[in-house]
Regions:
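Conserved, mostly hydrophobic/aromatic
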Residues: 55, 68, 107
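Short, charged beta->alpha transition segments
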Residues: 57-58, 87-98
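Canonical Radical SAM [4Fe-4S] cluster-binding loop centered on the CxxxCxxC motif
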Residues: 58-87
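Short Fe-S-cluster ligation motifs
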Residues: 94-108
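Conserved glycine-rich "GG(E/T)P / GGGxP" loop and the immediately following alpha-helix
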Residues: 105-124, 128
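Short beta-strand/loop segments at the ligand-binding rim of alpha/beta enzyme cores
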Residues: 131-138
Length: 138
């Protein structure tokens, strides 16, 4: 089971990637209102046919070896660090998919240890999802 704190750190860290239409919402939650615009984790994208797709948007790690000044996950940033294994990401993705929360995964990462090492972990995650978990989602 993935601890809630690591999950929150890595979904909140992913909100800075603005490639999903619902990333970085500035709307505030109102008491008694429905929905949650402030929390990261689920983003929405659109398929070629115009259909809206819900995606789990998460970082594999926010623990970066580089110190790029523009990046909130840079090495010297004063943020809590977290990393998920490929297996943990797969279990999380499949669990959310089975509960009908998402249709796919939007996975990104800080450069953890080295660029090559990070890319191998990302590829391993995709391979596990498709082969071991037989995930056909987006």
């Amino acid at each position: 089971m993935i601890e809630e704190e690591r999950l929150k750190i890595l979904t909140e860290g992913a909100k800075y990637d603005v490639s999903c239409s619902s990333s970085g919402s500035r709307r505030k939650n109102e008491p008694g209102g429905l929905g949650n615009a402030a929390f990261g984790g689920i983003c929405h994208s659109f398929a070629a046919d115009g259909r809206c797709i819900s995606l789990l948007k998460i970082l594999m790690s926010n623990d970066c070896v580089f110190d790029c000044r523009y990046c909130p996950n840079r090495r010297n940033a004063d943020v809590k660090r977290a990393t998920l294994t490929p297996e943990e990401i797969c279990e999380l993705t499949v669990g959310f998919y089975r509960r009908n929360y998402i249709e796919g995964l939007f996975l990104s990462s800080a450069v953890y240890k080295s660029p090559d090492y990070t890319m191998e972990l990302l590829i391993q995650t995709a391979e596990l999802l498709r082969s071991k978990y037989r995930f056909n989602g987006y």
